[in-house]
């Protein structure tokens, strides 16, 4: 009897399902992309190997001293690059710091450039007199763009002419005939904003006309004064406009909002001149009331300075703390905001005629410097130097030109002075200089580049 242990059982068959296939372990085909990468990596590996071999061969040929020298040179080059970057950053920081310091000192009226000694007296070839057929009568006003690219002049015949400084010619004009809706009589005052976005003008009407200085298109008309406007000025680096009028008031306008802001009262006679710088302040000359008023707009207060006998016709700021005034008695006065009386007075600055002093018809100041200019009808533009802490004024030289010096302005760098010249006074026709010509005088100054900067505390 055989044991079941020794019996072979039937082998169990494994039946596979239909559709089941035995997977073959075939290697995947490499894609073209992988092949390319493989080729690239192999090529780069080859390059690295070659480079390292070349380097090894170089280092094999190098002595220890040569290797030290090479590594030292490489280290020095890296240091030079790092230091150059640091120096560049430091230079930028220094420039920014100097600019901020300068702006702060300028705002406080503590900055002064001693530049008068660097001026050289202009020769005849440094003078240029230009005329325009549109200006048939006396020129009354002039203004210069802050980038010194163009100049505007106004005249008694009701025309405004735009001049190109680089082009040295007339670029356009606004005449009474073509713009009779906006220009009503002779142009009294013009001003341009610091960014050259707006040009404003006033004439024998109580309105202010706003223009685009680039296209000379009319933008807006401001109404509010009761008599014609004698002076216009923009607050520096803003679109705040200050206007002075024969109605004895000062008005403030916002050109950003195209709106009237407020009116300032105080003068007892028609205002003859106005000026402003960076601070929220305006300074005005009151004519026959013989006063200069500094309007502190933010504080809603004013400072009053009483001038010499006569009509106080002109006022210009030297900086935020000092200003110059001119009267019809021929006197020039230098003032400080901290004192009620002039620091210095020059009597009969332009001489006299028949024992009558020639009145001051215009002033121009080179901002934050010790230089200013004055004009009358003695055929001279006189330049003056302020010294000894503003307590003394010395004559520098004169520029000869025939006529009334009705308005003048320096360029920002002080290298040019533009003078509006006419046969008559800008405010009337008391008498006429027949030998004079109506035009724009350009005086070119030669200034040595280096000059001293003083800070006053």
Residue positions per predicted region:
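Intrinsically disordered terminal extensions that flank WD40 beta-propeller domains
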Residues: 1-138, 428-434, 444, 452-457
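Beta-strand-rich domains and repeat architectures in extracellular enzymes and scaffolds
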Residues: 130-158
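WD40/WD-repeat beta-propeller blade N-cap
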Residues: 132-139, 176-187, 223-229, 265-271, ...
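WD40/WD-repeat beta-propeller blade-loop signature
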Residues: 138, 147, 183-186, 195, ...
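Loop/turn segments within WD40 beta-propeller blades
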Residues: 143-148, 190-196, 202, 232-239, ...
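Structural hallmark of WD40 beta-propellers
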Residues: 149-152, 196-200, 209, 218-220, ...
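Conserved strand-to-loop turn within each blade of WD40 beta-propeller repeats
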Residues: 154-157, 202-205, 244-247, 285-289, ...
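WD40-repeat beta-propellers
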Residues: 160-164, 208-212, 232, 250-254, ...
């Amino acid at each position: 009897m055989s044991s079941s242990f020794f019996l072979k059982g039937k082998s169990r068959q494994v039946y596979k399902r239909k559709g089941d296939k035995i997977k073959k372990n075939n290697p995947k085909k490499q894609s073209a992309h992988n092949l390319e990468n493989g080729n690239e990596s192999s090529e780069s590996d080859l390059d690295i190997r070659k480079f390292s071999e070349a380097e090894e061969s170089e280092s094999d040929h190098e002595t220890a001293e040569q290797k030290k020298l090479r590594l030292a040179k490489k280290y020095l080059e890296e240091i030079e690059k790092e230091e150059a970057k640091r120096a560049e950053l430091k230079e930028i920081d220094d420039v920014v710091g100097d600019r901020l310091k300068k702006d702060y000192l300028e705002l406080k009226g503590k900055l002064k450039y001693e530049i008068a000694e660097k001026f050289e007296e202009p020769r005849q070839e440094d003078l240029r007199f230009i005329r325009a057929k549109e200006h048939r009568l006396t020129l009354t006003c002039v203004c210069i763009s802050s980038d010194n690219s163009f100049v505007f002049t106004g005249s008694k015949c009701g025309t405004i002419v735009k001049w190109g400084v680089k082009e040295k010619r007339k670029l356009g004009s606004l005449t009474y005939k073509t713009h009779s809706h906006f220009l009503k009589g002779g142009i009294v005052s013009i001003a341009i904003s610091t960014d050259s976005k707006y040009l404003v003008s006033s004439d024998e009407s109580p309105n202010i006309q706003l223009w685009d200085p680039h296209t000379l298109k009319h933008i807006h008309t401001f109404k509010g004064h009761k008599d014609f406007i004698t002076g216009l000025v923009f607050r520096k680096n803003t679109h705040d406009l200050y206007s002075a009028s024969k109605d004895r008031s000062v008005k403030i306008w916002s050109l950003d909002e195209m709106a009237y802001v407020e009116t300032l009262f105080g003068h007892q006679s028609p205002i003859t001149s106005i000026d402003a710088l960076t601070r929220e302040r305006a300074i005005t000359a009151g004519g026959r009331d013989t006063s200069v008023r500094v309007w502190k707009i933010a504080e809603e207060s004013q400072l009053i300075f009483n001038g010499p006998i006569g009509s106080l016709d002109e006022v210009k700021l030297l900086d935020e703390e000092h200003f110059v005034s001119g009267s019809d008695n021929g006197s020039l006065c230098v003032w400080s905001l901290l004192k009620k009386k002039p620091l210095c007075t020059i009597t009969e600055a332009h001489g006299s005629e028949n024992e009558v002093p020639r009145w001051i018809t215009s002033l121009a100041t080179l901002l934050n410097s010790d230089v200013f200019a004055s004009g009358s009808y003695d055929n001279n533009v006189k330049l003056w130097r302020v010294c000894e802490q503003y307590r003394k004024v010395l004559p520098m030289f004169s520029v000869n030109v025939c006529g009334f010096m009705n308005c003048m302005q320096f360029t920002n760098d002080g290298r040019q002075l533009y003078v509006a010249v006419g046969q008559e006074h800008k405010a009337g026709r008391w008498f006429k200089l027949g030998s004079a010509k109506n035009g724009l005088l350009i005086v070119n100054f030669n200034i040595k580049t280096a000059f001293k900067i003083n800070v006053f505390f």
